[in-house]
A protein has these predicted regions:
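Non-catalytic terminal segments and appended small domains
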Residues: 1-167, 175-179, 184, 188
Length: 188
């Protein structure tokens, strides 16, 4: 049977740790859950199509539902703060000293495009968990899909986790303002 196995990179972590990966379907954001499946008029009544059916919204799209419920999330193990340091540069503080290497500042990538509205300086997640996959399988590591509410944007990559299940860094850029991520926030 083909299975995804998560291997802890830290000896003290287990399946009950707050950073334990979880199925995306168990961590659907509130804004998605609370969105209306059918369009409402300004008076609160549902809009009706000529055939008498309700007018669907984006939430009724099966392709969007599949994206919002497929895969696994990697998460932050503690609170993380992005701030402007005394050199007037974006910096990061990981609130738990045992997890200081979870998020680190990286060397510049001058020839790699960066999205508008994000700092040119970039960081990397060093996840608490590695992924082990059956022979012939690879994993797509991406910014959490359709999560425009997060204050960072991750670089996307594919890793052959059937051959490599060592911890890997996952580069990302922070939005051009200070922000804080709470523990258990999804990062990939």
């Amino acid at each position: 049977m083909n299975q995804i196995k998560f291997v802890s990179n830290r000896p003290w972590l287990n399946e009950k740790s707050i950073s334990t990966p979880s199925p995306v379907s168990k961590d659907i954001p509130d804004w998605f859950k609370e969105a209306d499946r059918f369009y409402k008029m300004p008076d609160g009544e549902y809009a009706i199509m000529p055939d008498g059916g309700k007018v669907p919204t984006w939430k009724a799209c099966p392709a969007l539902l599949d994206v919002m419920t497929t895969g696994y999330f990697l998460k932050t193990p503690c609170d993380i703060e992005f701030f402007i340091n005394s050199k007037n540069e974006i910096d990061v503080k990981v609130e738990n000293p045992m997890m200081n290497d979870f998020c680190t500042k990286r060397q510049p990538m001058p020839q790699f495009e960066h999205p508008e509205g994000y700092y040119k300086e970039h960081f990397a997640w060093f996840p608490d968990w590695a992924v082990e996959l059956p022979d012939g399988y690879s994993a797509l590591y991406t910014h959490p899909l359709n999560r425009f509410d997060l204050p960072f944007f991750m670089t996307v990559g594919i890793i052959d986790n059937d051959k490599v299940n060592l911890p890997r860094t996952m580069p990302f850029r922070s939005e051009e303002h200070t922000s804080e991520l709470q523990s258990r926030e999804t990062i990939s």
